[in-house]
């Protein structure tokens, strides 16, 4: 398995669209497998989690439930493979859109960001990684829930959402004057409103 390999998952359901990206940590041998399992866990949770897009659902509880499910999947895989759970460490980010309800939730953990472009053309941050992460947060360590970013939004507010990878100082150079610069930049995915 290549270290640090990216996994992108796009899943259309009857009432929702899931778009996520994850990548294994550079020093983890099974990070790509962990990234795939993590995106599956997030997709399954948000699909089954009826009402997570509503204002009545507490985001801190959603974070805890989500992290618990991710850890469970990684732990089961580690047992199956005879490995340590930390070998499956990864960073992830993405968005789930419920077009019929005009709602979305974006999520991230570790490096990366989710940005939104309004109908007026302004690009603003929805979720950001910390500006200078000294040591990336670990899914399998105590306190990880505080590093999981979740944010709700109204889908019609945005013309386009962007999922970017890497540390903030890397991708911040690519966003200027309300546009994503061409060339070498960390843009992974762009989701346009229809």
Where on the chain are the PLM-derived regions?
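PP2C/PPM-type serine/threonine phosphatase catalytic domain
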Residues: 1-194
């Amino acid at each position: 398995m290549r270290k640090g390999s990216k996994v992108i998952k796009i899943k259309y359901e009857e009432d929702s669209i899931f778009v996520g990206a994850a990548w294994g940590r550079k020093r983890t041998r099974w990070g790509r497998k962990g990234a795939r399992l993590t995106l599956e866990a997030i997709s399954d949770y948000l699909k089954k989690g009826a009402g997570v897009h509503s204002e009545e659902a507490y985001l801190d509880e959603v974070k805890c439930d989500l992290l618990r499910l991710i850890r469970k999947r990684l732990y089961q895989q580690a047992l199956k493979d005879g490995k340590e759970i930390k070998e499956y460490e990864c960073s992830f980010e993405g968005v789930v859109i419920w077009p019929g309800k005009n709602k979305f939730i974006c999520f991230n953990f570790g490096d990366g960001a989710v940005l939104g472009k309004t109908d007026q053309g302004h690009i603003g941050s929805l979720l950001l990684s910390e500006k200078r992460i000294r040591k990336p947060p670990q899914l399998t360590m105590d306190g990880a829930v505080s590093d999981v970013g979740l944010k709700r939004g109204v889908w019609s507010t945005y013309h386009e959402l962007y999922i970017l990878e890497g540390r903030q100082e890397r991708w911040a150079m690519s966003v200027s004057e309300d546009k994503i610069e061409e060339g070498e930049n960390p843009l992974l995915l762009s989701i346009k409103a229809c």
